[in-house]
């Protein structure tokens, strides 16, 4: 029995019985109180019903208490504060969670929230101008793990990478590759400021020299540019794909911005918005304070972005008449919606925080308020090596690449560490700390817990084979798991699916890492108690019944840790 789901259903039934209303009760929350003094679980249903029925919340709570106290798994109910209903669950109901994990594993880990949601999540979308740096890895891991979580709770998810292959940075890339091409032909070159001086582009020049000789130099500029652009973008994308694959990340779609121009999708989108009355000719408001010399006060085509909550309307054309980057964003969102997405998630870097309102406006307009949109910002990664910050810049050629860090510590450490802080908070990544074998290193601490559970089961199989066979046959008495430490671990195990659901609901993958660290901590504490007090050991040869129950507990811990690591794309370790 999933206690959280069962209580939610019983609250809905009680709401229908007491107030002939189950829809409002369905929005009520079931949470674990921060203070155990307030019971095992808490619900705000009384306050929600009270607001609707214009009744005092405590009066509503008392009526719920009269109905719910009769449930067989409820030990006690207390009313707290303005009307919170706090539940204490009977120990045997918590203990039964272990049986659910071990004997009904597939059902326990299965979550089905809403199969009607078709989510498109765009993440990484790094400009294809060079190797990915460690800052990109944070958005990559966040987006990939969020996609995994959403798939785990049964949403249909498309993972997408937007290839910015139509902007000025691509022009700079082409110019740099052409210089490297000339260098490969024997010409002395200087990389001007503003281009890409990194040595990673030298092989591209050599490949072009080998394939074309000096033929590119005899072509007209447009023909030469087209060939080099196609070649350079594809090579850089191959590099990025490999970096991502080495992190365990694979997108379903790589979508080209240039294709929006080539297929006329931008013009088509603008015409649609004109028919909707959302494009007009006007001037942008002057910047607040001192007028900036680059402020463009010309009459131009603008999108009515302010109608949907943006701070100002947005230009769709540049001064030279070409489409703005914003116009590409409009067409791209339209394309996603036409492909069937009814929920768009954008994962952006800290340097794009100003894009949130404009993206929301785009989707609200084109989705006609029927398509959900969420824009998540991943803050900076402060990369530290031996305590010294490393500044990263593609243009200067001195950045810590994903490839370098992956080679140094491995993908599992990168993936886990990127989830050790909420995405909208800066994160310090210290190469020294992530390689320590101590409780100060969270990935080691969690993996070590998994290894220890495997060790417990292996030891039991070796020392007490007959009892181990009974354990595998499900012959254990879970009521023997009655110590405070055991019940706390069991409650945490039972809350795994609740944690997964919350991670999906709030788009917070870090909850999974935090949960695993917490579970590992409680398990290690009990293990250490066993060193001081033999009664807390998992394998007690003189007490086979208790050993059987604790083998069940250890196995449940192992399965939940493995499930959590699988969700975040980390391989559970069986030995160290």
Curated annotation (Swiss-Prot):
Short motif ('HIGH' region): ranges: 126-136
Reactions performed catalytically: tRNA(Arg) + L-arginine + ATP = L-arginyl-tRNA(Arg) + AMP + diphosphate
PROSITE patterns (UniProt xref): AA_TRNA_LIGASE_I (PS00178)
Domain of life: Bacteria
Gene3D superfamilies in alphabetical order: Arginyl tRNA synthetase N-terminal domain, HUPs, Isoleucyl-tRNA Synthetase, Domain 1
EC number: 6.1.1.19
One function term, GO molecular function aspect: ATP binding
Xref: InterPro entries: aa-tRNA-synth_I_CS, Arg-tRNA-ligase, Arg-tRNA-synth_N, Arg-tRNA-synth_N_sf, ArgRS_core, DALR_anticod-bd, Rossmann-like_a/b/a_fold, tRNAsynth_Ia_anticodon-bd
GO cellular component: cytoplasm
GO BP field: arginyl-tRNA aminoacylation
Chief location category: cytoplasm
Keywords per UniProt: Aminoacyl-tRNA synthetase, ATP-binding, Cytoplasm, Ligase, Nucleotide-binding, Protein biosynthesis
Entry's localization field: Cytoplasm
Protein family per UniProt: Belongs to the class-I aminoacyl-tRNA synthetase family.
Assembly description: Monomer.
NCBIfam families: argS
Protein name: Arginine--tRNA ligase
Protein source organism: Rickettsia peacockii (strain Rustic)
Lineage start: Bacteria, Pseudomonadati, Pseudomonadota, Alphaproteobacteria, Rickettsiales
Gene: argS
């Amino acid at each position: 029995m999933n206690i959280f789901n069962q209580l939610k259903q019983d609250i809905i039934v009680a709401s229908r019985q007491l107030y002939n209303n189950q829809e409002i009760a369905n929005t009520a929350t079931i949470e674990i109180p921060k203070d155990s003094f307030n019971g095992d679980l808490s619900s705000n249903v009384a306050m929600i019903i009270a607001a609707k029925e214009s009744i005092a919340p405590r009066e509503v709570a008392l009526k719920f208490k009269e109905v719910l106290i009769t449930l067989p798994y409820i030990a006690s109910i207390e009313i707290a504060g303005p009307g919170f209903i706090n539940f204490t669950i009977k120990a045997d109901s918590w203990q039964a969670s272990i049986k659910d994990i071990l004997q009904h594993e597939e059902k326990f880990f299965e979550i089905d929230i809403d199969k009607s949601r078709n989510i498109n999540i765009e993440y990484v979308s790094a400009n294809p101008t060079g190797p990915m740096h460690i800052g990109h890895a944070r958005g990559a891991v966040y987006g990939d793990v969020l996609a995994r979580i959403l798939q785990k709770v049964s949403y249909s998810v498309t993972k997408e990478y937007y290839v910015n292959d139509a902007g000025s940075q691509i022009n700079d890339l082409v110019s740099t590759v052409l210089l490297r091409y000339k260098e490969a032909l024997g010409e002395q070159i200087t990389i001007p400021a503003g281009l890409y001086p990194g040595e990673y582009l030298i092989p591209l020049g050599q490949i072009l020299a080998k394939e074309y000789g000096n033929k590119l130099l005899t072509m007209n500029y447009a023909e030469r540019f087209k060939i080099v652009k196609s070649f350079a973008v594809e090579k850089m994308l191959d590099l990025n794909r490999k970096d991502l694959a080495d992190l365990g990340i694979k997108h379903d779609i790589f979508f080209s911005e240039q294709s929006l121009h080539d297929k006329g999708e931008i013009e088509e989108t603008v015409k649609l918005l004109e028919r909707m009355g959302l494009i007009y000719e006007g001037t942008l408001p002057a910047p607040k304070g001192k007028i900036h010399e680059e402020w463009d006060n010309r009459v131009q085509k603008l999108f009515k972005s302010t109608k949907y909550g943006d701070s100002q309307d947005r230009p769709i054309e540049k001064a030279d008449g070409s489409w703005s980057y914003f116009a590409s964003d409009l067409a791209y969102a339209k394309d996603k919606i036409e492909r069937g997405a009814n929920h768009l998630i954008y994962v952006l870097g800290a340097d794009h925080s100003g894009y949130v309102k404009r993206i929301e406006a785009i989707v609200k307009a084109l989705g006609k308020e029927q398509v959900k949109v969420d824009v998540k910002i991943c803050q900076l990664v402060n990369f530290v090596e031996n305590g010294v910050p490393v500044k990263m810049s593609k243009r200067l050629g001195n950045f810590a690449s994903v490839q370098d860090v992956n080679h140094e510590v491995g993908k599992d450490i990168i993936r886990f560490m990127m989830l050790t802080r909420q995405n909208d908070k800066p994160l310090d990544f210290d190469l020294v700390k992530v390689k320590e074998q101590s409780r100060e290193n969270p990935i080691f601490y969690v993996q070590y817990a998994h290894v220890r559970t495997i060790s417990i089961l292996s030891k039991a199989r070796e020392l007490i084979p007959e009892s181990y066979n009974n354990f595998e046959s499900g012959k254990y008495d879970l009521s023997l798991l009655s110590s405070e430490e055991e019940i706390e671990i069991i409650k945490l195990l039972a809350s795994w699916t609740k944690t997964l659901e919350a991670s999906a609901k709030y788009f917070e993958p870090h909850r999974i890492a935090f949960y695993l660290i917490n579970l590992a901590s409680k398990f290690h504490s009990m293990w250490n108690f066993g060193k001081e007090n033999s009664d807390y050991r998992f394998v007690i040869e003189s007490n086979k019944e208790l050993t059987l129950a604790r083998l069940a507990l250890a196995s449940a811990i192992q399965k939940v840790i493995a499930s959590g690591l699988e969700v975040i794309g980390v391989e559970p370790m069986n030995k160290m």
